[in-house]
Amino acid sequence: MPEVFSVYNCGTSHNRQNLDETIADLARRTVGAENRDWMINDGPGSSSHHVGKSATPLDRSLAAQAKTPGTRDPISGLKEGSALAGIRGVVSGYGCEHNVDHTMAVLKATIDLPRTINMAGWSRGAITCFMIAHALNEDPRTKAIAVNIWAFDPVPGPGNFDDPEKVTLPANVQNYAAIVQQDERRRIFKPVLIDDDHAPGPRTRFYYMPGGHSTGVFRSKNEVGLIATFLVHRFLQKHGTRLNNPITLSPRDLCELYAKVRVEMAEYQKSGGGALLLLGRQRRMLPNRFQDTGYFINDHHANQFRKTFPVVWSALEHGVGAARQPAFQSALATLKHTAPTTFLSLEKVGILS
């Protein structure tokens, strides 16, 4: 087994076939062989999608590999379990434990364990990352492995907040980063918000983004998804995962994407609903100091803007005196030419007139 092993955990009702979803796409992009360099766990409540005669070899292979968690022995792979595993998976997260057992079985089958395990997951898949980390920490053979976790909107679902292995990070987690969607309003989609009390050891980083529960995990559907995909690619590569054709974005690119988000903010704010709102509403109270401000989306957006347009940033922060007007006007002209969406967004919110 290599020095770094990567584990991907799909969200509820999603599996390796959903290549437009970032977790499945990460598995597709990761260099090496499945179960040697990386592995993917299908999400609770998911099932293999039928593919037609015109399907590509990749589509047929993914369909054959996709299994509903809870219907196979996690070690032998032999068919077992409840015919209601799919429904139970959607409702309660049934199958997450099977994914933990399967991951541990893959690791224990190797002679040489990795030094580092990187994980990424969405929704209950992110919670599965927590559970795997706890399982690794409790096993003497795997306890010393360093763990890094990227979570997309970690949501355990009702009835699961009382289990510490689903809402806390153990001591073996070195780095934890999460995308948290600030406009999800369904009460049953309450996220796990790791704080210093629950994670005194690891380095943590949070990206609070507009949109609903799934907004950040579909890279081709919106700008938030593309930004989030870039961020998870960068996180995994930093900690040793090798990716084919990783997404690269410059600070200017990020400013332009965030600017488009600002222009379309009203649409993002509508995306956190659906029929399940009938089960209860709850606004997410997140520590995003930029959430109710007029322009910046989050601290990541502000930092990219400050690096890319330092003169304009200084003017926004301190104002512009007469002596600095020529430099400011020159910087503004450059911004308009090189980052037109950013310029437009500043006009739209009334910062520029």
For each of these PLM feature ranges, what is it?
Residues M1-S353:
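Active-site- or binding-pocket-proximal scaffold segments within functional domains
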